[in-house]
Amino acid sequence: MNNLSYFTKTKLVWVILSLSLLSACATKTPDNLIPVQVNHVSQAQAWEMQGKLAVRTADDKFSTNLYWLHTADINELKLTTMLGTTLLSLTTEEGVAKLEVDGKVYQHDDAQELLTEITGWSIPVNALPLWITGQAAQDDKIINQDLQLRPTVLLSEKDSPPWRVEFNSWQKQSGAEIPRLLELTREQLRLKIQISQWQALSATTLATNNQKK
């Protein structure tokens, strides 16, 4: 990645804090995807979620609204205000990650590295689609489980230092059990994600065929 202008963490925090009294906005679901019910999150062909993201570091803390669209081909993450202002947009498609922030666009072949380089945050965007849905990656070590065998604490051992993920509460949405609140910590960085809405999605053609069976 060449000639990337460094966007400081302090500047981005200032932008978000200036809008922190505003709450979530609705984001339109792609026309080729429709809501479906599933028995388990792993059955979801795609999904979208809305919630809150709180970030605390040694020097700063803030919270904002989080939108995430996850499909087999696309990941789209947005930090937004209720008025529709996009503070940060990170999209990965066909192996290319694109970050839009502060009126500038940056590209890289790795979304996590791009976000870290431009914002200064080491947020695990590559692993979050699994953690948001209460699942562990192959490299994750499950430390504790509840009586329903859902993970309550796991460590991402492929990262050094590792991420510690705590699933503090659960809920049922789109027919599946998903986390309501999860907390991620790594050294002095702490992230809290509160999921207020999670919707399983399916391609319209596939959903129509299933209904006919």
Curated annotation (Swiss-Prot):
Gene Ontology, cellular component aspect: cell outer membrane
GO terms (BP aspect): lipoprotein localization to outer membrane; protein transport
Signal sequence bounds: 1-24
CDD domains in UniProt: LolB (cd16326)
Record localization: Cell outer membrane
Pfam families in the record: LolB (PF03550)
Lipidation feature positions (S-diacylglycerol cysteine): 25
Domain of life of the native organism: Bacteria
Lipid-carrying residues in chain (N-palmitoyl cysteine): 25
Keywords assigned by UniProt, alphabetized: Cell outer membrane, Chaperone, Lipoprotein, Membrane, Palmitate, Protein transport, Signal, Transport
Membrane topology reported for the UniProt record: Lipid-anchor
Listed InterPro entries: LolA/LolB/LppX (IPR029046), OM_lipoprot_LolB (IPR004565)
Principal place of residence: membrane
Described function: Plays a critical role in the incorporation of lipoproteins in the outer membrane after they are released by the LolA protein.
Similarity field: Belongs to the LolB family.
SUBUNIT field: Monomer.
UniProt-recorded name of the protein: Outer-membrane lipoprotein LolB
Species for this entry: Shewanella woodyi (strain ATCC 51908 / MS32)
Phylogenetic classification of the source organism: Bacteria, Pseudomonadati, Pseudomonadota, Gammaproteobacteria, Alteromonadales
